[in-house]
A protein has these predicted regions:
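Conserved ABC ATPase signature
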Residues: 136-140, 144
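Conserved ABC ATPase "signature" region
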Residues: 66, 103, 115-132
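Short coil-to-helix segment of the ABC ATPase nucleotide-binding domain corresponding to the Q-loop/switch region
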Residues: 96-104
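ABC ATPase NBD coupling module
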Residues: 67-84
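Conserved ABC transporter NBD signature motif
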Residues: 56-66
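Conserved catalytic motifs of ABC-family nucleotide-binding domains
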Residues: 157
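Catalytic Walker B motif of ABC-type/P-loop ATPase nucleotide-binding domains
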Residues: 161-164
């Protein structure tokens, strides 16, 4: 599914951030640990195509495709069907309803048909926010917005889910729902990478997943 080899990234003249080597198969998840500045968000940006994999900075192969060979438009095309992206800041569009936000990936691809609408509604039910479907995102709590953001990332059933600090500032109930839905996605054959410093992630995962959905942990070098 995903193979990362000797990957690094450099911002301007700053020292390069090194991510080393790792791989991820379908039906598995990785938990990225590391302090502030370790590059957790940068790594996710590289994997989802927001940042380019620079020449001589290693390789990333996703579902048999080398990301460093892709143009900007081709990288943008990874989202949302190859990669589902849940950024640290939720970035829900305030001009759309919650349902329209969840449906947005399908709408942008011209695939907002009846089946897509039914899937979006089903996702809202699974995240316990179906009653908020026709509200604007600015009326949501932090936890509700996080659930809507994850539902949007899962809307197109991507091969790989990237979640940046998905439980940040959430209460226990919302954190549990978010991790449970990520675990279900992995149990269904997806692959996920979670970047987080939340010590509750692993215990939450163990409480909601079965032995078939493993959560391995890697520490990014300082």
């Amino acid at each position: 599914m995903l193979t990362v080899t000797n990957l690094s990234h450099q911002y301007g003249t700053n020292a390069a951030i090194s991510f080393g080597n790792f791989s991820l198969d379908a039906g598995h998840a990785l938990l990225l640990r590391g302090g502030s500045g370790a590059g957790k968000s940068t790594l996710l940006h590289l994997l989802c195509g927001v940042l380019p994999v620079q020449a001589a900075s290693g390789t990333v192969v996703l579902a048999g495709q080398s990301l460093q060979t892709l143009t900007r438009s081709e990288r943008d095309g990874l989202r949302p069907y190859a990669v589902g992206w849940m950024p640290q800041r939720q970035f829900l569009m305030t001009s759309l309803t919650v349902l329209e936000n969840v449906l947005l990936p399908a709408s942008l691809a011209g695939r907002a048909d009846d089946a897509a609408c039914k899937r979006a509604t089903a996702l809202l039910h699974s995240f316990a926010i179906a009653d908020l479907a026709h509200l604007r995102p600015q009326t949501l709590s932090v936890g509700q917005a996080a659930r809507a953001s994850l539902a949007r990332a899962l809307m197109t059933q991507p091969k790989l889910l990237l979640a940046d600090e998905p439980t940040a500032a959430l209460d226990a109930v919302s954190s549990g729902l978010v991790i449970e839905q990520i675990a279900r996605y992995v149990q269904g054959g997806g692959a996920a990478i979670i970047a987080s410093h939340d010590p509750a992630i692993h215990p939450l995962w163990d409480s909601v997943s079965n032995s078939d959905a493993t959560l391995d942990e890697i520490e990014l070098p300082k």
